[in-house]
Amino acid sequence: MKGIKALVLMAVAVCASLVAQAQGNNGLKYVNALELQIINKGFEDTYSPYSRLPLKVEETIKTLDGRGALLDRGRNSAGIGIRFSSNSARIGVRYNLVVDFHMVHMADTGIKGTDLYILNDEGVWEYVNTNRPIKDSIQHKIYADALPTDRMREYIIYLPLYDGVNWLEVGVDSSAVISKPIVNNPRKEKKVIFYGTSILQGGCATRTGMVATNMVQRDLNVECVNLGFSGEGKMDMFMAEAMASIPEAVAYVLDPIPNCTKDMCTNLTYDFVKKIREERPDVPIIMVEGPMYSYTKYDRFTKNYLAEKNAEWRKNYEKLKADNPKNLYYVTAEGLSGNDNEGTVDGIHFTDMGFRAYADKLIKVLKKLVK
């Protein structure tokens, strides 16, 4: 099976190379991203290098009726980044999308674009540019042509949030050097594991660097594994088991309430969280309430129902806390998308402002837990 998969991947790479040559390379030399460093990924044994679920979980999902969407979302590359060092004045990218997905309420730059960041002289990750997806089999972009060349610099390319990539290459000037990162930032030995829904996956950031998990990664210098799955954050026990198996985990952030019914919040929460606690008793767990969407101020049923779900979530937190008060934390819904009702694109899914507010609220808790 592994031999067949290797042959298929080799064939894809050869075809990609031929297509890229036909398009021209803009004077850049391109390196397969697999020769660099993949960050913000929780599992090695995945369907592709740029997908998020372990094969064991994929096989479990295939046995379940009506859960195909979780399989699809798991093959989106949300949160994953490519880390490398280079002294090139120009940096480019080219890649092939899995789906070429589109949504009416989210920018294509967030769905299937890529962002380039540089680690500046102050040690802060600084945004450089975004590639705007085009109607072509190969996405390509030269992000910049005047990057500093005085020494090797550190870079991240963030991958699509609501699509996946079959392959990706990073381009640099023909005389430049490109290598695996020299600086350990984010720290690969520390991973914060985020689990949740479409919002956590990145709906609806305008570009890939603006999802909350990538903000936390840059601000706290730790890898952040994005296990947000649109419509599918339903506290499946196999997900708790998978998350508990990640050896580098230094904190878990659990945010599934938007995808759960009140009954699910009542009946699944305790066992789901308990499973992670049993497997990783020394790793902090942060339980995040579901956001009180801005439109609910004027929608009586939804306002009451969301409050009821959060109340059940809170009851289970108190029960778990009574069992063992250590390493369990709670974040309320207040201010999750900001405090002015302007943090969403559709009353539910976050804008960049909403993600900044969410990240800031989580950072206040995480920075005390992640040394």
PLM feature spans:
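Histidine-centered active-site loop/cap adjacent to the catalytic His
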Residues: 346-371
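Short helix-loop-beta junction
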Residues: 213-226, 318-319
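Structural recognition of the beta-strand scaffold that forms the well-ordered cores
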Residues: 191-194, 223-227, 250-255, 284-288, ...
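N-terminal secretory targeting modules
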Residues: 2-3, 18-191, 367-371
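Bacterial N-terminal signal peptides
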Residues: 8-17
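Substrate-gating cap/lid alpha-helix
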Residues: 293-331, 357
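Oxyanion-hole/transition-state-stabilizing segment in secreted/luminal serine hydrolases
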Residues: 204, 208, 216, 234-279, ...
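Catalytic nucleophile-elbow at a beta strand-turn-alpha helix junction centered on a G-D-S/GDSL motif
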Residues: 189-210
